[in-house]
């Protein structure tokens, strides 16, 4: 765990405490992370589930969750109001009965708790699929007015003797083959996310080509997306298209892309598609010694994040802090 980065996030949360919903309140990993959070006063866990079952699950694995708020959809006093609001949000696509049935599930119920202001953010996916976490967010939280898509970013951290290396990579998890305009949005959102984690973003639009050395539709896509991103955010350091070696090696960057404000010093990487992105971040994780935090969902009106179903309690704890830091 990148202790320095997380301590900075915790210090920020201490100044403005948040409430986070966990959609799977009986999961042992969620309970362990919640017990750790309850030791502080800066991030209050809300566990969804039957109160007796949640407490029994915590007792079985030996975690003290005294003080945690537990909310059971089946006995929630404001359920009628929640159903009414969800019907309005779905705009005729779901009946009241269908909404009520959906709200008996932690993913929909938790998302509506965020929508109604009971919680500031949500973390799910310990047992739910990514689709089952993202779908309610798209339907109920929706994207920000300036955003057309939900995208994602991984924060990659490698601890060093003197300092940490912190990078941002997107989109490695959500958009399979983004268009030029979607890549513009992905780049700008990743840059915003990078700033939250102390990165001064230098954004590289990656390709197998550097400054026209290669030809093809994907090269054109990255070059055009980069040009549009630069026009949309002239104050950001953005450049491309470029190969990864030109992006990270000052020597290669100077040779292949002289005069670039990014080449050789990039720290925020935009991949042409999910294949490249997913492979890229996992190479950095498995061979480069980086810890990967994410996927962090970008573009929504409130922070909703997805865990890997193979996550451990430490990863739940870390992602809870990251999610709350974005609230």
Predicted regions and their residues:
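Anion-binding alpha/beta catalytic cores of soluble intermediary-metabolism enzymes, centered on
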Residues: 1-263, 267-327
